[in-house]
Amino acid sequence: MEKILVVEDNKTLAKLIAKKINLELGFEVEVAYSFLEAKLFLKRYSYFLTLVDLNLPDAPNGEIVDHILESGNHVIVLSGNIDKTFRANMLKKNIIDYVNKGGVDDINFIINTIARLKKNKEHKILVVDDSMVFRKQMQSMLENMFFKVITVAHGEEALGILNSVSDISLVLTDYHMPVMDGLELTTEIRKKYTKNDLTIITISGDNDDDTTAMFLKSGANDYIKKPFSKEEFSCRINNSIEALENIYTITNHANRDFLTGLYNRRYFFNNMFPYFEKAIADSEKFTIAVIDIDYFKKINDTYGHEIGDRVINNLADILRTNISQDDIVARFGGEEFCIVLKNITPEQALSRFEKIREKVQNTIVSLENEEKIKFTVSIGVLLHPEETLEESINQADMLLYNAKQNGRNRIEHN
């Protein structure tokens, strides 16, 4: 478990902050009430970050901030007196942020800031600028915000990275660059990635007011004019990443089955139509199967819908853990699921589904009264898909029907 160090001489406040961080974010939190205690902790451990009171009894002039930065730890400064002079002095240092410690809202802000930094570790940012000095400056600021950073010198290199690295969240690009400038890059990126997929922020010293509108109309999410403060930079980056996460959350809810967390029927067809056409055109071997729980109505009638839901979730877990990352499994509704195994031979597909059938057959669902129940599935496997996706699903359904008619707990294939 990652650790956070809180350094604050007000013991009540320090304990309150530590407790909220532990309960809400899951970090192990250690508390020091003086500069001396903090030094002892820092000698023994490294921390995800430190929350540091600027004015301690044995370090009244903020000496602790420089000491912790020199030790290689990240710092968020706590202060009860934030004014323009304070801001200017703090922003000269390589701190993450500063926070007022006046009340409950300030503590909530601390929690939100740490939560944001924790999430930032999951994101990659691509910095595109022909100035090595500026690239390194951007990289340093972004890494201090816990982002993973890739840097390149121009637009063509950026497109190459985007083609080979699939999980980039944000592109931070300069305008004027050799080979391919930022505007051309933005236009090219938007041919492949929507604003729901990837955020683009332009940074430029161009003083023409039309430039901002030009970039925004070409698909940029935001535009930062040089020179800018570190504070403005971090706020804009964090806000853009948070907006992207919110879009992902909304989209994910729309695409997921509420009970199992698997994809739903809507997502399956939206995703499968383009894949199906390309796979047929490329002669890619793939398999479509429809899976149904045997005697599910009897399970519901005998044990109730809560147990029925538990059985559905048990099957969902088995399906989820027995497919590869590229395959698709979706709950079509009720007790019926559909699976597409990609880049697989018929022999391999049948072996995989037999393994799934056996795992389900051997699964035991324990009830609260210590009773145990078992269930089975029937599977219709289409090894050689039809001309269209709809025809293929219908054919797999017919094979499933045959499996039911021929005794259940079995696989039928074409």
Over which residues does each language-model region extend?
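Conserved nucleotide-binding and Mg2+-coordinating catalytic segments in signaling enzymes
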Residues: 251-270, 291-305, 313
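Hydrophobic framework residues that shape the active-site pocket
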Residues: 296, 315, 329-332, 337, ...
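Catalytic-core segments of nucleotide cyclases and related cyclic-nucleotide turnover enzymes
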Residues: 350, 382-413
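Active-site-proximal alpha-helical element of nucleotidyl cyclase-like catalytic domains
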Residues: 307-328, 336
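Active-site-proximal structural segments of metal-dependent nucleotidyl cyclase/transferase enzymes
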Residues: 271-303, 319, 330, 349
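Short regulatory alpha-helical coupling segments
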Residues: 251-252, 265-285, 316-324, 342
